[in-house]
Amino acid sequence: MYLFYILPFISQFGESKNAIKGKTLNDASISNLLIPLPPLSEQKRIVAKIEELLPLVDRYEAAWTRLEDFNRRFPEDMKKSILQHAIQGKLVEQRPEEGTAQELYEQIQAEKRRLIKEGKIKKEKPLPEITEDEIPFEIPESWMWVRLQQIGELSRGRSQKRPRNDPALFTNGTFPFIQTGDVARANGHIAHWTTMYNQEGVAQSRIWPAGTVCLTIAANIGDVAILDFDACFPDSVVGFNAYRPILSNEFFMYGLMCYKTILDKMSRSTAQKNINIDILSQIAFPLPPLAEQKRIVARLEELLPLCERLK
């Protein structure tokens, strides 16, 4: 056993010049190896000590691997935990003087009726009531569950011409065209773009205003960010605009980040991995009072940069 442990170490110093491509030792180099030879009783003590220490080395290596994995995952896991606390009403305290989500919801419905009457939005088909089976977690009593389409405009991007990458849409372009990769890389706010439409491209698309929440529904499922400028995007991206100033788009952007895993699972149940508007419009979403939405956003914008600094 002494030789079993010592030979791999000693063989490093063998002459491997004549070995096959340097990957193996030849007979001559092995036979010429110099090996330190202690007395037999000492060999046995050396082997015993090695066999005592090697399991500790293995345990240390396993512990180090777990620690490296923990350090690698910790910033993202911490971010997910903070967002989950936010959307469950655990990040900031509830204040009775800020009213209830039910009161806010009634304001939203009044605003929708006004916009419908003015012809600015179309009347939607009634959505089904949210059932207990649809509720993924508990929320504070002052909050309520709603469907996204009940509290804002939810629509797919538009790119009518095929193929979507037709150069005729982009040559000499000057208007931002956002794609799924831009949303994925944005880290919350889309401040840059890589592609631009020309006038023909814009004409066959739709312009979304700055402040729109962008959600990817194909390729990278469930990535979310807010537009910092007016832009077009294709039908692989959904735009959501809560009825402002009654609601905070920033709150819904952070809230939708928590739904990435849920949306990804939903997308796998389809023939092609994507999410459609019908699925999104049915999702149950927690709604806090507006003042609490703003306090949640302010707290998140304090904490999330700290997670980024840990990376």
Model-found features: residue ranges?
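Short amphipathic coiled-coil heptad-repeat segments
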Residues: 54-102, 113, 302-311
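Cys/His-rich finger/ribbon microdomains and the adjacent scaffold used
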Residues: 103-150
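Amphipathic alpha-helical segments
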Residues: 29-65, 248, 252, 281-310
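Sequence-specific dsDNA recognition surfaces
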Residues: 129-134, 149-168, 181-210, 265
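A short glycine-rich beta-alpha junction/loop motif
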Residues: 1, 10, 19-37, 171, ...
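Short, surface-exposed loop/turn microsegments at beta-strand edges and helix-strand junctions
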Residues: 7-9, 23-26, 166-175, 187-196, ...
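Non-catalytic DNA-recognition/assembly elements of restriction-modification systems
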Residues: 44, 63-66, 72, 80-81, ...
